[in-house]
Amino acid sequence: THTSAVWAAGESGKIIHYNGIEWSSLSTGVSTNLIAIHFVNTNTGFAVGDRGVIIKSTDGGTSWAEQSSGTTNTIRDVFVTSATSAVVAGYYGYIKYTTGGGNVWNAATLPGHPVPYDADFYSIDFTSATVGYATGSGGTMLKTTDGGATWSEYATGVSATLWGISFANDNKGFAVGTSGTMIFTTDAGATWNA
């Protein structure tokens, strides 16, 4: 989000927007619960949610177009790195990326590919257009250095589900999870400490 604009997604396809002065409700055209939303600028953003829904706006949320995700499983998070590139993640090892504005979503190469990766993913954060992290069940931590096309697994030392991840800069980041779990890195995810 941006200094003067905030978007929030919720139940039954609801999105609300704050323009710096007031809140307004936006019509998305979907009735599915939305779980995450991310805008790269004041115009371009994606929202994701239950039943594999991905929707995109290029006009600040005034109108939304549904994208083909290739799944009916829940998509938990989205991170938009440019007006044409984004990464989504969800249940059953689901990570896809687009470099064409959402017209095509490509399956990411995950550790052990082509063997199905069975972690559920809950959160994504990027520190640049190419470097990003995904967290999930069983202490799963993945990192990409090519914008989401391929991912490598990093040991976290925890088995708790990691619900969220956030980086303050290229090197320093935190992940939080069940049972009060909090881990941090100061070396771009190479090592994680409690």
Spans of features found by a protein language model:
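Residue-level hotspots at or immediately adjacent to binding/recognition sites across diverse folds
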Residues: 1-194
